[in-house]
Amino acid sequence: MTQHSPYSSAIAEQRNQEWLRFVELLRQAYAEDLHLPLLQLMLTPDEREALGTRVRIIEELLRGEMSQRELKTELGAGIATITRGSNSLKSAPVELRHWLENVLLKSA
C-alpha cells in the first residue's frame, strides 16, 4: 500500500492552485480579447497541435462512427491518447457532454 506524504499532498494542492490561476488568467484574457496571444505565449506549437487533436478525438468519440483503432489511423494519435479521451468522456458530467455534443456535432 502506498503512503501519501504531506509533502506530495502539498505539491498536488500547489499544482491545482497554479492550474486554477491559469484558468482565471485565460478567462480574463477572453474578456479582453487577448486569449489567442496568451495561448500562443503559454503553449508550444506541439502543445497547441495536441489540443486540436484532442478536440477531434472527443468529437469523433461523440459521433461514434469510428472505432478507437480507426481514430488512431485517421488522426495519427496514439491509442493511449484516444483511450484517455474515451475514459475522460465517460466520466465527464452529463451537462458537459451535452454541451460538447451541441458545440462539436451540431455545428459540423
From Swiss-Prot:
DNA-binding region in chain numbering: 68-91
InterPro entries recorded: Trp_repress, Trp_repress_bac, Trp_repressor/repl_initiator, TrpR-like_sf
UniProt feature coiled coil, ranges: none
A GO BP annotation: negative regulation of DNA-templated transcription
Predominant location: cytoplasm
Pfam families recorded: Trp_repressor
GO cellular component, one term: cytoplasm
Keywords carried by this UniProt record: Cytoplasm, DNA-binding, Repressor, Transcription, Transcription regulation
Signal peptide from the UniProt entry: none
DNA-binding listed as a keyword: yes
Domain of life: Bacteria
GO molecular function: DNA-binding transcription factor activity; sequence-specific DNA binding
Keyword Transcription regulation attached: yes
Subcellular location as annotated: Cytoplasm
Subunit structure: Homodimer.
Function noted in UniProt: This protein is an aporepressor. When complexed with L-tryptophan it binds the operator region of the trp operon (5'-ACTAGT-'3') and prevents the initiation of transcription. The complex also regulates trp repressor biosynthesis by binding to its regulatory region.
Family: Belongs to the TrpR family.
Official protein name in the record: Trp operon repressor
Organism the protein comes from: Salmonella paratyphi B (strain ATCC BAA-1250 / SPB7)
Recorded name of the encoding gene: trpR
